[in-house]
Amino acid sequence: MSLKVVFMGTPDFAVPTLAEIVGGGHEVVAVYTRAPAPAGRGMALRPSPVQALAERFGLPVLTPSTLRGPEAAETFRAHGADVAVVVAYGMILPPAILDAPPLGCLNLHASILPRWRGAAPIQRAVMAGDAETGVAVMRMEPGLDTGPVAMLERVAISPEMTAGDLHDRLMPLGADLMHRALGALERGGLTFTPQPAEGVVYAHKITNEEARLDWTAPAARLHDRVRGLSPFPGAFFLADLGRGPERVKVLRARSAEGSGAPGTLLDEAGTVACGEGALRLLRVQPAGKAAMEAADFLRGRRLEPGTRLA
């Protein structure tokens, strides 16, 4: 026996889970994803990674602009799904959708719930300097990531791990976890535990303001911020490159020894003074350019020790 599944997801993170469900023998009766969006230099419409995979599998794809209203609910119920699997879909599911599948809606969430409920759990965990995070399979409720948890896989966050590194580590783990959860659900053996009332922290969307590096902060905190925002959207500073202040992303860095006025470039290797200690820039990306080693960037733009970065 296999389950009839509606899959709902959009970005790369959701792709391995869809592939695992199809490979596991379940019948994916529909795939919901966000509509194609402009991308690339030509801003041509590009389907989401989930849509691209679904079409390769020959699965029916829906890209509704809303799931609210009786028509959307009726369309969803008409799929006759036993369960819905939701992975980074990017749209709120109203009660009429949540209540439609007899076995409920399962969500794969990239954190150890209830810590980091919300939109940016991977980035927030790294930015906060957390030593571990994980992936969880939960049953969805109307509240934001408040549902009971069935399965959890923990992962250590190493001191130099970026959000991109962690994202790539959690993707296959999450896919395997959901595969096991569906197997248990099929056998009637999937049990759910309510989330603790204590320890709730929300992973709000990243703002442009917090992506800018504040050199008056301690170097350790800035290091975590660089890791948590790499590769996207990228922590950044401003430097005068001859045409006024230009944005430069910092993709990799590490804490270093050094002192001086915050934001001062201390050497040719890319060490910048912070409120406490210093930050060594390792890899950067100037606006509109490819990523490069920080020392090469400084040498090419003739940014010498004593230069102030904003």
UniProtKB/Swiss-Prot annotation:
Keyword line: Protein biosynthesis, Transferase
Listed InterPro entries: Fmt, Formyl_trans_C, Formyl_trans_C_sf, Formyl_transf_N, Formyl_transf_N_sf, Formyl_transferase-like_C_sf, Met-tRNA-FMT_C, Met-tRNA-FMT_N
Substrates-to-products reaction catalysed: L-methionyl-tRNA(fMet) + (6R)-10-formyltetrahydrofolate = N-formyl-L-methionyl-tRNA(fMet) + (6S)-5,6,7,8-tetrahydrofolate + H(+)
Annotated binding of (6S)-5,6,7,8-tetrahydrofolate, by residue: 111-114
EC number, UniProt record: 2.1.2.9
GO molecular function: methionyl-tRNA formyltransferase activity
HAMAP family: Formyl_trans
PANTHER family named among the record's database cross-references: METHIONYL-TRNA FORMYLTRANSFERASE, METHIONYL-TRNA FORMYLTRANSFERASE, MITOCHONDRIAL
Protein name: Methionyl-tRNA formyltransferase
Recorded name of the encoding gene: fmt
